[in-house]
């Protein structure tokens, strides 16, 4: 995608129709990409360096501190008694941990180890169990209050507050998981899957008391973001410190000792390197789009193709967002779509926040949509 936009910028004067322009020398493109405000060192990489890395480390710390296992036990205690309970527990656990981890595919690999065998054990088919895990893990990215790192990136991008984004995203997230719950329940009725005996389920209060401290870092995050209105990066640092401190309330095997801290930081930074490389490359794309004007032309083309009709524009933007999101992780997918697709909706007087939420919802759908559906792998 990025190389195609670079080629378009350089050879624009040889291209027909929508892509035609004056064309720019490679030296101009390199200058724009390296020195321009919208280039490699522009907003995408700046957000990755200041915000995303902190929350990727936060997710890795929570994972090393045993949070994923506790979320799974809590989810079982809350929903395991109902028909198809383990599948509903998988939805709850994957949603809770997916919101923290920020990576649908990574979350599927982490929680899926527990949830998929559990769903298969009570009678769900392997394909359905994997599908439930993939959909729930992806939905964690749109679930407040954390929403991976997307809420913080969006706040910077459209110049609004984190609180406003959380409020706007709450109802769609509830509807998303309500539909997943209903699907799981109906499939359980269809397959004749009964509820697990309560004797086989963990008790709510013993489980809650055993791991209530895993909720404290999330409370710290909300406090510093909403009440103290700290920048997301600073709030994330305090949250990481809270994870470290509360880990010593967990069983000794989950204490964040120096060795486990190194492992968590290593894992978080490894995830960030991928994001940083992609966001830097996206910066090159944004620089090329700014130089060539193709981004504006694409937005206008979509609106013109839809005849200025908002419904048709939403359909076109949704389809393109689904295709563009394939193969990208959540954060790079959002940045790419915010650059290419959101302006088309804003041009039709759709509020910026609604436009950005719309494109990321459709972009994330690519995680469980063939042919790529990387959360399924």
Indicate residue ranges for each PLM-predicted region.
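Membrane-water interface of transmembrane alpha-helices in multipass transporters/channels
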Residues: 160-167, 233-237, 294, 312, ...
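Hydrophobic core segments of alpha-helical transmembrane domains in multi-pass membrane transport
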Residues: 4-13, 51-61, 94-98, 156, ...
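Transmembrane helix-loop boundary segments of multi-pass membrane transporters
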Residues: 151-152, 156-175, 232-234, 358-364
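Long, contiguous bundles of hydrophobic transmembrane helices that form the permeation core
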Residues: 1, 167-271, 374-377
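Hydrophobic transmembrane alpha-helical segments of multi-pass transport and channel proteins
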Residues: 142, 161, 173-178, 232, ...
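Core transmembrane alpha-helical segments of multi-pass membrane transporters/permeases
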Residues: 5-26, 30-69, 233, 237, ...
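Membrane-interfacial loop-to-helix junctions in multi-pass transporters
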Residues: 38-51, 77-90, 122-128, 209-215, ...
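Hydrophobic transmembrane alpha-helices that form the pore/transport pathway of multi-pass ion
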Residues: 72-140, 150, 159, 330-365, ...
């Amino acid at each position: 995608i990025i190389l195609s936009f670079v080629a378009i910028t350089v050879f624009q004067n040889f291209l027909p129709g929508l892509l035609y322009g004056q064309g720019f020398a490679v030296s101009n493109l390199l200058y724009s990409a390296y020195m321009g405000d919208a280039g490699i060192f522009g907003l995408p990489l700046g957000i990755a360096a200041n915000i995303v890395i902190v929350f990727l480390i936060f997710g890795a710390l929570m994972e090393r501190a045993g949070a994923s296992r506790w979320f799974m036990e809590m989810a079982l205690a809350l929903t395991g008694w109902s028909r198809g309970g383990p599948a509903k527990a998988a939805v709850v656990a994957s949603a809770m941990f997916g919101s923290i981890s920020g990576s649908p595919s990574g979350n599927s690999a982490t929680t899926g180890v527990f949830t998929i065998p559990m769903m298969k054990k009570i009678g769900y088919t392997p394909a359905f169990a994997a599908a439930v895990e993939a959909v729930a893990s992806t939905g964690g990215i749109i679930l407040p209050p954390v929403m991976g790192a997307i809420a913080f990136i969006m706040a910077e991008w459209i110049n609004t507050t984190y609180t406003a984004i959380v409020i706007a995203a709450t109802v769609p997230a509830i509807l998303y998981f309500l539909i997943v719950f209903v699907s799981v329940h109906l499939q359980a009725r269809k397959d004749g899957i009964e509820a697990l005996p309560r004797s086989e389920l963990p008790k709510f209060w013993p489980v809650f008391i055993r791991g209530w401290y895993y909720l404290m870092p999330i409370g710290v995050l909300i406090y510093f973001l909403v009440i103290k209105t700290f920048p997301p990066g600073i709030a994330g640092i305090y949250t990481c410190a809270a994870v470290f401190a509360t880990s010593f309330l967990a069983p000794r095997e989950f204490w964040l000792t120096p060795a486990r801290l190194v492992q968590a930081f290593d894992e978080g930074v490894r995830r960030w390197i991928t994001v940083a490389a992609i966001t830097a490359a996206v910066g090159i794309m944004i620089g090329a789009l700014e130089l060539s004007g193709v981004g504006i032309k694409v937005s206008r083309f979509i609106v013109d193709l839809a005849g200025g009709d908002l419904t048709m524009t939403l359909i076109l933007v949704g389809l393109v967002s689904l295709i563009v999101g394939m193969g990208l992780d959540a954060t790079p997918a959002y940045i790419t779509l915010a650059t290419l697709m959101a302006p088309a909706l804003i041009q039709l007087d759709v509020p910026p926040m609604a436009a950005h939420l719309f494109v990321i919802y459709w972009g994330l759908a690519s995680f469980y949509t063939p042919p790529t559906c990387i959360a399924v792998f």
